[in-house]
Amino acid sequence: MKAYAVPFEKFVNLADARLGTKIISVTDDWFADANRLFQPTPAVWKEGVFDDNGKWMDGWESRRKRFEGYDSAVIRLGVPGSIKGVDIDTSFFTGNFPPSASLEACFLASGEPDENTQWTEVLSAVELQGNSHHYHEISNDKAFSHLRFNIYPDGGVARLRVYGIPFRDWSAVGDNEQVDLAAALNGGRALACSDEHFGRMSNILNPGRGINMGDGWETARRRTPGNDWVIVALGHPGEIEKIIVDTLHFKGNYPDTCSIQGAFVKGGTDSQIETQSLFWRELLPSQKLEMHAEHTFVEQINALGPITHIRLNVFPDGGVSRLRVLGKVAK
């Protein structure tokens, strides 16, 4: 996998189609469906492929504007959250990209935006280039549920990535309700790992079961002593009651065994947490894994009390499709 271009790429992509992100309204997507903006895979070029409206493009593309104004798309994020940064990707759009773009946001507990909705500008107009990634950090701790993506005056954008921290009203969770505290939809975040050569570490926190091997976390073959690992920050502190390690689609490349450590972390940077994790207590002792299967652990879990972070160790290497860490929220 390619290296992270910017630090905020490690946050959850709130605009991922797999989380349910979709277009609510769009001024014009004549040439290319605006919902393609949210596909998790990189944009592709299809040489010589045309449809009824022109050249097929992997992204959102509007018609050439012949009057005043600009194009925009109203987006419902798959999960509300605070935004840390965005990537406006114009891959393969060369003579047809917008010269600039901006981003507005709002939070609605229910329903969709209308003409009375108050929008907050989170990214003022920025210049765009063709066939390029445009990374912009955003400093706003408010949670947003919808975006309005403006392009000036028209053109095409391949992907819109919106990285941030998912929002959940934890006060509404019942005292005895069991929640997947590691789920991306609940604010869980993969912080660091030993290796992610074949698949991103963040994939293991996505909803549903993996669609293929590429939709999981997979390391390179280990040729040195040791083992691979990934550290996850839980969406909320909690007491762990059940753990699911899913090796779906991993058959000749699943880990032989796994274990999990946990801790209640009160401070420190992501890099400091990586070092601290060596000394965390054992939450789940070493367990044998099988290929292409869900492994559920309950009785095997050690009672550590409330924790905020876990470290999944896989021995010696291999792939994991999903990790579920279920428990009760610490009030």
From Swiss-Prot:
<keyword id="KW-0659">Purine metabolism</keyword>
<comment type="pathway">
    <text>Nitrogen metabolism; (S)-allantoin degradation; (S)-ureidoglycolate from allantoate (aminidohydrolase route): step 1/1.</text>
</comment>
<keyword id="KW-0378">Hydrolase</keyword>
<dbReference type="Pfam" id="PF03561">
    <property type="entry name" value="Allantoicase"/>
</dbReference>
<dbReference type="GO" id="GO:0000256">
    <property type="term" value="P:allantoin catabolic process"/>
</dbReference>
<dbReference type="InterPro" id="IPR005164">
    <property type="entry name" value="Allantoicase"/>
</dbReference>
<protein>
    <recommendedName>
        <fullName>Probable allantoicase</fullName>
        <ecNumber>3.5.3.4</ecNumber>
    </recommendedName>
</protein>
<dbReference type="InterPro" id="IPR008979">
    <property type="entry name" value="Galactose-bd-like_sf"/>
</dbReference>
<dbReference type="GO" id="GO:0006144">
    <property type="term" value="P:purine nucleobase metabolic process"/>
</dbReference>
<dbReference type="InterPro" id="IPR015908">
    <property type="entry name" value="Allantoicase_dom"/>
</dbReference>
<dbReference type="GO" id="GO:0004037">
    <property type="term" value="F:allantoicase activity"/>
</dbReference>
<comment type="similarity">
    <text>Belongs to the allantoicase family.</text>
</comment>
